[in-house]
Amino acid sequence: MTKDTFIEKMADILDVEDEISLDTNLSELDEWDSLSIVSYVAMANAACGKKVYVKSVREAVTIQDLYDLLK
């Protein structure tokens, strides 16, 4: 998945109108909550066929960290 596609998917998951980037800090997003985490895990597992665990997602600080989990 390209970075641009990933950012678009994350914007959909977070339902944000403001632009996000790979440098966006997750703790600064009110929309980053347990529902968003579950949605991210489902998207990651479906898109990459790789098992992504909630524990790893909770340790992420930025959008880039979430993207790196897909590799």
Where are these regions (language model features)?
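Phosphopantetheine-dependent thiolation modules in NRPS/PKS and related acyl-activating systems
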Residues: 1-42, 47-71
